[in-house]
UniProtKB/Swiss-Prot annotation:
UniProt topology in membrane: Single-pass type I membrane protein
Keyword tags: Disulfide bond, Glycoprotein, Immunity, Membrane, MHC I, Phosphoprotein, Signal, Transmembrane, Transmembrane helix
High-level lineage: Eukaryota, Metazoa, Chordata, Craniata, Vertebrata
GO biological-process terms attached to the record: antigen processing and presentation of endogenous peptide antigen via MHC class I via ER pathway, TAP-independent; antigen processing and presentation of endogenous peptide antigen via MHC class Ib; immune response; positive regulation of T cell mediated cytotoxicity
Modification type Phosphoserine: residues: S343, S345, S349, S352, S356, S359
Protein name: Class I histocompatibility antigen, Gogo-A*0501 alpha chain
Disulfide bonds: C125-C188, C227-C283
UniProt-listed SUPFAM superfamilies: Immunoglobulin, MHC antigen-recognition domain
Extracellular side: 25-308
Quaternary structure annotation from Swiss-Prot or TrEMBL: Heterodimer of an alpha chain and a beta chain (beta-2-microglobulin).
Bias kind Low complexity: ranges: 342-359
Length: 365
């Protein structure tokens, strides 16, 4: 996405992945959307993506040639044309609503129309291993900063500043929380269960991580030990370094989990150690795909070759996934969207409560 800098894109994905960490055995469906104004270059670019757990399944980009909601997972191909028509219309409606929300936000913050501004939203639901509703959420951001978010009870809102307080009062007067709660506890859960069944071969699988350690001297007195976990699914994983059995959390450099581009994930954890003391350090790996946690120790005689090509390819795809997929996720940075005088309406307004629509229609700030 041309209007978003690469560093921002990395933050977007890291935020998206952070959101996928739910309870063991639970599943989530989440939608991320971003609208970015570009003065002098036409209407804002609007991108929306949907995720079930760590897998992207739908995507809409207002700049795409098709101008349609498109499948991003094989198991979505079975949906009928009417489904795609409806979701496309919802996305186009949201793009127009967020265009107006951007204009309203300029007034709230007393900003000029010369600069580029961003509205973002994340909403979704989690279910337990039994398929029952666990929790729902909606969080919005303006220009990368928290704006407004639903509270845990889904009956009230938390505003981040005075501008968001205006939106909060409007939403309270229009009973938006009740509509959101009905969607999250009903429609969202119904569709998540459906997707988990249709895509169970992908969504309910576990791929154990491929692990190894590497060693790199950084001076005559110190070296970096790095613990690698590659090709794992789902994304949630724990990597920790210990020295003589004691956690080295404070001294560990831990990167965010990253998509490898093939449906699996990558992660590493590094620690700087005194030269000659490497054998005192062990890396501990915990993942759902492992029968029991792994313990790794660097062996001087078997220094593995770091799969540079695979890592670089993953990082390139990582940026691409973000730009296209999650130009929406800036770490729960929420879009301001309350309707100035209108209604919040769910994706299918009256009929979405009956499970006919998957996503929500936005609301103005």
């Amino acid at each position: 996405m041309a209007v978003v800098a690469p560093r921002t894109l990395l933050l977007l994905l890291s935020g998206a992945l952070a959101l996928t960490q739910t309870w063991a055995g639970s599943h989530s469906m989440r939608y991320f959307s971003t609208s970015v104004s570009r003065p002098g270059r036409g209407e804002p670019r609007f991108i929306a993506v949907g995720y079930v757990d760590d897998t992207q399944f739908v995507r809409f980009d207002s700049d795409a040639a098709s101008q349609r909601m498109e499948p991003r997972a094989p198991w979505m191909e079975q949906e009928e044309p009417e489904y795609w028509d409806r979701q496309t219309q919802i996305s186009k409606t949201n793009a127009q609503i967020e265009l107006e929300s951007l204009r309203i936000a300029l007034r709230y913050y007393n900003q000029s129309e010369d600069g580029s501004h961003t509205i973002q939203r994340m909403y979704g639901c989690d279910v337990g291993s039994d398929g029952r509703f666990l929790r729902g959420y909606q969080q919005d951001a303006y220009d990368g900063k928290d704006y407004i978010a639903s509270n845990e009870d889904l009956r009230s809102w938390t505003a981040a500043d005075m501008a968001a307080e205006i939106t909060k009062r409007k939403w309270e007067a229009a009973h938006f929380a009740e509509q959101l709660r009905a969607y999250l506890e009903g429609t969202c859960v119904e569709w998540l269960r459906r997707y988990l069944e249709n895509g169970k071969e992908t969504l309910q699988r576990t791929d154990a991580p491929k692990t190894h350690t590497t060693h790199q001297a950084v001076s005559d007195h110190e070296a970096t030990l790095k613990c690698w976990a590659l090709s794992f699914y789902p994304a949630e994983i724990t990597l920790t370094w210990q020295r003589d059995g004691e956690d080295q959390t404070q001294d560990t450099e831990l990167v965010e989990t990253r998509p490898a581009g093939d449906g699996t994930f990558q992660k590493w954890a590094a620690v700087v150690v005194p030269s000659g003391q490497e054998q005192r350090y062990t890396c501990h790996v915990q993942h759902e795909g492992l029968p029991k946690p792994l313990t790794l120790r660097w062996e001087p005689s078997s220094q593995p070759t770091i799969p540079i090509v695979g890592i670089i390819a993953g990082l390139v795809l990582f940026g691409a996934v973000i730009a296209g997929a999650v130009v929406a996720a800036v770490r729960w940075r929420r879009k301001s969207s309350d309707r100035k005088g209108g209604s919040y309406s769910q994706a299918a307004s009256s009929d979405s409560a009956q499970g006919s629509d998957v996503s929500l229609t936005a609301c103005k700030v």
